[in-house]
């Protein structure tokens, strides 16, 4: 493990302590670098059942234990109202409109790097905030760039593309310089109880519940037909909002007569007729796109790539970068043409653009280009 010499004596950092290993090690590394470190635990969702309450209470307990071990203060704050207004209502509206949003991206934009930063500034007098995200920051020519995390498998820049360079400049990402295995090793060496804690998965307000069960409590079911791409009715669905392009599981249409053994995939959602359209094979022509139109553009450096640039794009998390060419239809509408067709590009999701290691920013996928 590389030692880090103290170089930041006196600068105050508020670390978002989630009760997980990444934020735990982030706090330790910043202390080792000489920062004055305090923790802040966010409550972003008002639980309505015992299981969710226990999960949040356990996370707070773990965060407190880590802070006690490190000898730092832990503050708590409730952002449930801000989360509901700025993240959850957007999430529901997008699903109601037949799109597939990413609430984690909106949470980072509105809560972790806005409400959290404002609270850390105004109440806790912070110089910086820090999170356990796997990204890196690089300061160059008076601006702050966001780079992919060293651990390519854990890189979370896709979820942080809505940050501006001012927010990046106020943020520290210690674990972005490490592999996940190194983070767990450090936590174990330091005797932190989170060293072997399982990484959280899924959307925080859903927890371990089934997604469809959760969504049905807020959006009533709207049953309709499932059709093949040739127009044959082969089943029914409970609501288009429960399905996403490229989905394979949970369709309930296996073992049909007169069909080959290739699995069925969702290839389109017909919102006008409330019909789910499916096709066989992961490379079904109606599942493929040659490009996309993105809007609600956000660039970390405010400028964005030049018109006609050849860069790369991710249309979903953990996807390999896709080489592409970008042109502007307007200041807030970007036309993206892939070098090769891409499967299951999904309206409502984010397209995030890169120039090598640099995360440039991105936008919301509004439409697909298929010719």
Curated annotation (Swiss-Prot):
Xref: Gene3D superfamilies: Adenine nucleotide alpha hydrolases-like domains, HUPs, Translation factors
Subcellular location: Cytoplasm
Signal sequence region: none
Catalytic reaction equation(s): S-sulfanyl-L-cysteinyl-[protein] + uridine(34) in tRNA + AH2 + ATP = 2-thiouridine(34) in tRNA + L-cysteinyl-[protein] + A + AMP + diphosphate + H(+)
GO BP annotations, alphabetical order: tRNA wobble position uridine thiolation
Major site of localization recorded for this protein: cytoplasm
A GO-annotated cellular component: cytoplasm
Region (Interaction with tRNA): 154-156, 316-317
Enzyme class: transferase
InterPro entries on file: MnmA-like, MnmA-like_C, MnmA-like_central, MnmA-like_central_sf, Rossmann-like_a/b/a_fold
Annotated protein name in UniProt: tRNA-specific 2-thiouridylase MnmA
Gene that encodes the chain: mnmA
